[in-house]
């Protein structure tokens, strides 16, 4: 069982979408099932409507989930399991306030050492616990031994004892921390494999320790995806437009092309242009590079252009391109759905022609409107020349403006073959 577990706290990042796609592909390959879990326990950061936005984006990418969970619905179980660990002395109550903890963190930072909880409350007597009026967090007791797990991309990953302290499971307000909620939910939902970002590597041993303390014997495999870098070779920030899936879609990239690019990124693939469905035949998480991959929007644009060429008429119409034959034609100079739509809309809109060309444009317009519109462009051109006596730039510039609304563009001869049936409608505007 695979899962994708986003938080409704902002726009979906391309790194998150990449993880969703990989989990989904693997779930289809072994027919094990795919869970969508909305991790909404951080009330302060949750944004209304972002869960629906997640559903909408996944649907656009044709990613279908078998079961939907909201993490907040499991709060009762998180608290019950924390109580179980306390009862079994595998966890303890911590009364340290935030001010004290922050002061210790600053001291560690000043000393150039990583902060590690010092166990202040771990060995309090029952009387000390019962007599303490302050609110308490719940921390897991940690054995002083190394932790390791096998990562399908990185291989064996090991953490020394000093790298994992007695971390918090439940905060003083009785809400679960990310690691506790995630570990419990994966256990309860029968998750067997998790593909997620490299920033979660240090969370994995903690989640394994939680389930181990609860006596859970089910095995969960992991693969941590390397980070995606921007064109400067730095970690892609959420503040960068191209890191947002919503922004890429609105800009005019097809879901098919974005999925293609994210599967291709840092991967060994038998070909460059493919669909998510086609990748099921050969995708393997083990082929993903351990090294960070650089996001190249120019490459994405090239892939987008190829998917526009391959798309059916029906699909292009779904994307707002009412003239599919023209859409494919304009891939010779455009890569985005939005750019192509602008080009086509310009052809079928009223043209604003400058005074320099207006007189000649009117002569050409009259000639075309009175023509029988031959199949051959050269025949129409010669017909216009005979009627107007216009030649060279005096003919072609106003004619181009009448057809496209632009001084530059494709060969009129090529364009004519695609729009001749509508040419009187176009010219008359």
Swiss-Prot record:
Highest taxon above the source species: Bacteria
Major localisation: cytoplasm
InterPro entries: aa-tRNA-synth_I_codon-bd_sub2, aa-tRNA-synth_I_CS, aa_tRNA-synth_I_cd-bd_sf, Glu-tRNA-ligase_bac/mito, Glu/Gln-tRNA-synth, Glu/Gln-tRNA-synth_Ib_cat-dom, GluQ/Sye, Rossmann-like_a/b/a_fold
GO BP: glutamyl-tRNA aminoacylation
Record-listed E.C. numbers: 6.1.1.17
Pfam assignment, any one: tRNA-synt_1c
Annotated Gene Ontology cellular component terms: cytosol
MF terms in GO: ATP binding; glutamate-tRNA ligase activity; tRNA binding
Subcellular location as annotated: Cytoplasm
Locus of motif 'HIGH' region: 6-16
Binding-site list for ATP: 238
Record's keyword terms, sorted: Aminoacyl-tRNA synthetase, ATP-binding, Cytoplasm, Ligase, Nucleotide-binding, Protein biosynthesis
Substrates-to-products reaction catalysed: tRNA(Glu) + L-glutamate + ATP = L-glutamyl-tRNA(Glu) + AMP + diphosphate
Motif segment ('KMSKS' region): 235-239
Function: Catalyzes the attachment of glutamate to tRNA(Glu) in a two-step reaction: glutamate is first activated by ATP to form Glu-AMP and then transferred to the acceptor end of tRNA(Glu).
UniProt subunit comment: Monomer.
Family stated for the protein in its record: Belongs to the class-I aminoacyl-tRNA synthetase family. Glutamate--tRNA ligase type 1 subfamily.
Protein name according to UniProt: Glutamate--tRNA ligase 1
Organism of this sequence: Campylobacter fetus subsp. fetus (strain 82-40)
